[in-house]
């Protein structure tokens, strides 16, 4: 899975972002389990997933603080 960019994340709806966080957390759990059992080959993926989760939370917080417009609320007629 490639790195998620903030610009791509800003195009997603709030529900899609929450689903993305859930998926990433599940992946992180699996990676941590593999790491603990010594089966993890790509250790850099742990860091990538943690940073992706932080990016999603940042976009959600920007919307909560009205720093950027929510694509759900700016539907044009």
From Swiss-Prot:
Q: Which UniProt keywords apply?
A: Ribonucleoprotein, Ribosomal protein
Asked if the record carries the keyword Ribonucleoprotein, the reply is: yes
InterPro entries with a match to the protein in the record: Ribosomal_protein_uL29, Ribosomal_uL29, Ribosomal_uL29_CS, Ribosomal_uL29_sf
Which Gene Ontology molecular-function terms are recorded?
structural constituent of ribosome
- Which terms does the UniProt entry file under GO BP? translation
CDD domains in alphabetical order: Ribosomal_L29_HIP (cd00427)
| GO terms for cellular component | cytosolic large ribosomal subunit
Establish whether keyword Ribosomal protein is in the entry: yes
SUPFAM superfamilies per the record? Ribosomal protein L29 (L29p)
Organism domain of life: Bacteria
**Into which family does the record put it?**
Belongs to the universal ribosomal protein uL29 family.
Q: What is this protein called?
A: Large ribosomal subunit protein uL29
Organism this protein belongs to: Cutibacterium acnes (strain DSM 16379 / KPA171202)
Q: Name the gene that codes for it.
A: rpmC
